[in-house]
């Protein structure tokens, strides 16, 4: 009796693992089948200087961001890119996409509940090894505004 209960438990656990894996794959495929809407924007720095370019694509849930720049941060600093939820009317929430690599590029891909809530991409110059999860707004170096479907 005890052995049959253990066997039933093991088989049920294995079935659940297989089913959850299949469901995750099906969800990922359904998200990829939605059409992507893409835009390219200039990252505008002080005085209207073009700091770099941001390519952004979304289908509402998946977001894919590619950033390029020719600028190099000051010694001991790094450039960090942020997706921001409307600096004036939204929550002001900033999601770090990570630091710009030495090659001057950044690639960010994420599946989100609502990727279109974001309205801006902001670049800041942060201390290397900075432990703060918050952006240093006083050290913002460039920004681009996202067009619809973003900001919804």
Regions from the language model: what does each represent?
Residues 13-23:
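Hydrophobic alpha-helical membrane-insertion segments, chiefly the h-region
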